[in-house]
């Protein structure tokens, strides 16, 4: 497990950045952190699918693609799956991954009580290093409706960006994996996260309406939720992010200080106005 380096917090006044600007700037970091979490989830699920089926179904288009240039090995004695991207390989969506993701598992993920613990060894997505420990525990399985409910805890989470800045994260979330009427894989996420942003300031994120991710959107290069609402707080300043009504796009509505605007989201840590 990676140890997060402690550092002195700086105030908005000392840093010369007002809180409303911090929320605006830091939300781009939130998008990147959330995208990194989803990326890791997709990769580890794909590796899981190599060795066992979920409800007798596969999703070859996505599963195979994300592991195209990775070496995946399973140690059945110690119950460890190692996903190795080597010195770096570019996926079909333009993301370059390097290093290793290590999954310690116990039980079939369709079984209540089974778990997966995910750690990283020098793992990067593009120029951003991903660290921390993610533990996933299955709490409910509904075979009739083809859904699995999982509690996920992130401890010691950290992203270190190419410019040397970093952000930390602790999170507690619940995810429900299911298939909709069209057969698309849909994930709903609830929960919260907190940490220290790239400016050294404490932040908190609360999901106030469940986030919805669609695997078909991932195929189209959309790595953000298609619907759901977040509340993002830095100091006394709060922003509300509404991801919309299910469209496969990178657009969201940000409301801050009573002013709403449409924004375009970038998973590489920058926010572009629409």
Predicted regions span which residues?
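Sec-dependent signal peptide recognition
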Residues: 1-3
